[in-house]
Amino acid sequence: MAWFILKDLISGRRDMHAFAESFAHEDYFMQQARANGEEIGSPDPTPGVGNFLKFVVQLSKAKSVVEIGTGSGVGGLWILSGMPADGVLTTIDSEREHSKIARNIFEEADIPATKYRIITGKLIEVIGKLADSSYELVIIRPALDLFDMIQESYRLLKPNGLLIIDQALSAGKVADPTQRDPESIARRDGIKVIKEDEKWAASVLPIGAGVLVANYLNIAIR
């Protein structure tokens, strides 16, 4: 492929990505949460991913959602904006500062305390205490212990529940086999596990830093 054609192709993809991100509108509280996240360096979802999360929640009519990786609350605000009146978000983070900032922004946004619970602790330990087959959607953001969190998702999800892994492609690093840092390896292995497991029907979407969406089929494997 001629270099100028490749250059135009790359430029076109960047333009499409930028347009997709700008399509999503963030309200004042989402913008404030994002600004807070930038100050503390929390890995929050992009506007495009946040809007996608809201879309999935609305489409699935999910009333029980687990978010692993609260961050500054950006993701939680998007999720809650799509949940029905009787829905509850359980959001988990290992950093107390993240949990505090997220709680503050939820309160500022006048979200009823009955709509969410924020849990702080070692992620895999907290997840292990959640009830079996009780959630319609699980969202995973961190790469640490990703394999174990995917396995726990089997247990947490109701039949035909959805798993979403945010930042699944590490903004392209996962697709590059020369990238051998721990995060890229963990995410690459996580995608492989889901792809090769017949219990999941999955797709990878190039929005934000990459999103993997998987439907738990709850089938008996011979």
What do the PLM-derived regions correspond to, one by one?
Residues 1-137, 144-164, 168-222:
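A short alpha-helical cap/connector motif
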